[in-house]
Amino acid sequence: KTNWASYLTSPKLEKHLPKFLFESEMQVILAEPLSDSFSDLRDYLIFEILYCTGLRVSELASLKVSLIRESDGKLVVRGKGNKERVVFLGESAKKCLQRYLVLRNSRNKLDKSEDALFLSQRDQQLSIRGIQYLVSSYLDKLGIYKHISPHVLRHSFATHLLNSGADIR
């Protein structure tokens, strides 16, 4: 018997470059928080941390206040495979984090044992889907009507590092 399928070649799939934002677009997004309200400051901080650290949205959602060292902007992150690693915040993100923590900790309804960094309006830990929604709605408030997911910010982080000559391996 002849296996006629062995004469066929499979089609080559196109490799797509990941979506990313240009540095000028990130400057618009990170210009400043829309207001000093709890939700606007939280949403802005989400962008700051995603972009300056390259975290996955799942890592961001699981950040704990107890694993933050405010003094030097050090965050302990639990990533894929339950592995811990340390990331550092830039100056802008550190300042925003300090402002956010003051607002977060002064909320009346807040259960003081709640350790999640990012909280909803009901003072519960934000879910991954909740963060994805907040990213989209914050961009709408800024008048940026592109579909940008938290993962696009991760790609932007890596792309901008590469463009600056960093080795990201």
Residue ranges and their predicted role:
Residues K1-R169:
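Conserved catalytic core of the tyrosine transesterase superfamily
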